[in-house]
Amino acid sequence: MTYIRVVSIAIIWLLFSSTGLADEQQRRAIIETVNQFFLAIETKDAELLESILIPGSLNISSSEQLEGKPELTKMDYERMISALTRPGRDTKERAWDETILIQGHIAIFWAPYDFHVDGKFSHCGVDSFQLVNSGEKWLISNASWTRETQDCPQSPLGPISQ
């Protein structure tokens, strides 16, 4: 009786631990895709950005106007690539405390972020990326974010490195 119980517990543990391992591998792959997005912006690498975005995506940023109404900026795929890889200013975006939800071949990445331009703090907000798994890798199907300039929390990542 004890032997059967031990074997049953071991089988159950293996089933749950392998599912947990798969979920963790998916989480890491999603985080890697988001980090590639940030790297593409920082290095102005349009090719890298194109390799992780789904063509035809619609992307939206939201910032608050003086009257308290939201200002929504919509960018299609081509405009997003052009705007985010335009040469000129050094930019750095960092996210932390991410929440990742995965169901089958779709996922959501949600995290607070800060954004720096030419080494100086510019704004903060929340990033929301919707991703799909192509069978080979996770791709961003939509990027939406808030853009806030006031009441930004201190990043737990510390100061940016130059």
Segments from the language model and where they lie:
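Sec-dependent signal peptide recognition
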Residues: 2-9, 131
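Short, low-complexity N-terminal intrinsically disordered segments enriched in polar/charged residues
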Residues: 17-51, 159-162
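Short, solvent-exposed secondary-structure junction/capping segments
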Residues: 35-39, 53-67
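A mature extracytoplasmic/lumenal domain signature
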Residues: 53, 63-64, 111-113, 127, ...
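Short beta-strand edge/turn micro-motifs at domain boundaries
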Residues: 108, 124-151
